[in-house]
């Protein structure tokens, strides 16, 4: 059997960009982590070590920094589109690319004014710890003949509800020890990704709105299973935003089991099972 080179791509991972705008007395900050991967016919680099078709990964890094200065860092989706279109359309050997951006949010520190009121500080922030906003852009082909697929979302959003969740009537075998319950704590570290139908989108408004809908559904749905809650979260977001084609979730259970205090001879009030 012959040996052949399989599909391949290459790029520069995790290029951290912190862009601070100091045009006015009130500064603004944008904090992103950008990874690039380029696709094309790079077989010569693998088979003979010929680098003539290879745009160095260091050049990709420098391009990210240059674009952060030249076009600015606004919405991550717009930055990814500008960067990806440049690599594919302006670099002859490149036939496609994947741009991934993680975005980190900061909020202003609140300080006391001379009159005793609180105000937001003009140039000091504290890093928010809720979730990381994500953007993934895939481009296949050059110019108008190419296709652009943009997926937005978030990861590491930890949510918990202390009631309003049930789990019972499940399949049981000889190894099952889980006790059915009509009232439990439900928690997860949520990853959500939604694919847009196009690129003429108000990215910030969509992100904020979709996240809010998902949180409301998580809170309000009387959950018989985490899967049911996720479906309702996705359904509600899709109904509200026609710009979105599909939504995918990853949501591992973060279990919170009731501890049997009778083991240490402490009684507790009767609770629903």
Locations of regions flagged by a protein language model:
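Hydrophobic, ordered structural segments
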Residues: 71-152, 156
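Single conserved hydrophobic/aromatic residue that forms the stacking wall/gate
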Residues: 264-273
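Short acidic amphipathic segments
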Residues: 93-97, 238-250
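Beta-strand elements of well-folded, non-transmembrane domains
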Residues: 19, 36-42, 101-105, 141, ...
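Charged, well-structured binding/catalytic surfaces in domain cores that contact anionic ligands
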Residues: 134-209
């Amino acid at each position: 059997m012959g040996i052949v080179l399989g599909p391949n791509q290459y790029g520069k991972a995790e290029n951290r960009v912190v862009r601070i705008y100091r045009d006015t007395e009130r500064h603004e900050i944008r904090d992103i982590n950008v990874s690039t991967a380029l696709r094309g016919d790079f077989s010569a680099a693998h088979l003979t070590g010929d680098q003539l078709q290879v745009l160095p990964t260091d050049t990709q890094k420098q391009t990210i920094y240059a674009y952060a200065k030249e076009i600015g860092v606004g919405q991550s989706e717009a930055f990814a589109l500008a960067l990806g279109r440049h690599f594919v359309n302006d670099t002859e050997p490149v036939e496609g690319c994947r741009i991934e951006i993680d975005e980190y949010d900061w909020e202003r520190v609140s300080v006391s004014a001379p009159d005793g009121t609180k105000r937001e500080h003009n140039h000091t922030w504290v890093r928010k710890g809720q979730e990381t906003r994500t953007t993934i852009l895939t481009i296949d082909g050059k110019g108008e003949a190419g296709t652009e697929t943009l997926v937005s979302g978030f990861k590491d959003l930890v949510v918990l509800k202390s009631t309003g969740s049930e789990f019972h009537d499940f399949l049981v075998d000889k190894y099952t020890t889980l006790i059915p319950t009509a009232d439990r704590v439900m928690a997860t570290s949520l990853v959500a990704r939604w694919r847009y139908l196009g690129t003429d989108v108000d990215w910030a408004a969509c992100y904020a709105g979709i996240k809010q809908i998902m949180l409301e559904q998580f809170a309000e749905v009387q959950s018989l299973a985490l899967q049911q809650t996720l479906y309702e979260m996705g359904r509600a977001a899709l109904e509200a935003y026609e710009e979105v084609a599909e939504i995918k979730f990853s949501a591992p259970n973060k279990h919170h089991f009731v501890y049997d205090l009778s083991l240490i001879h402490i009684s507790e009030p009767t609770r629903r099972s």
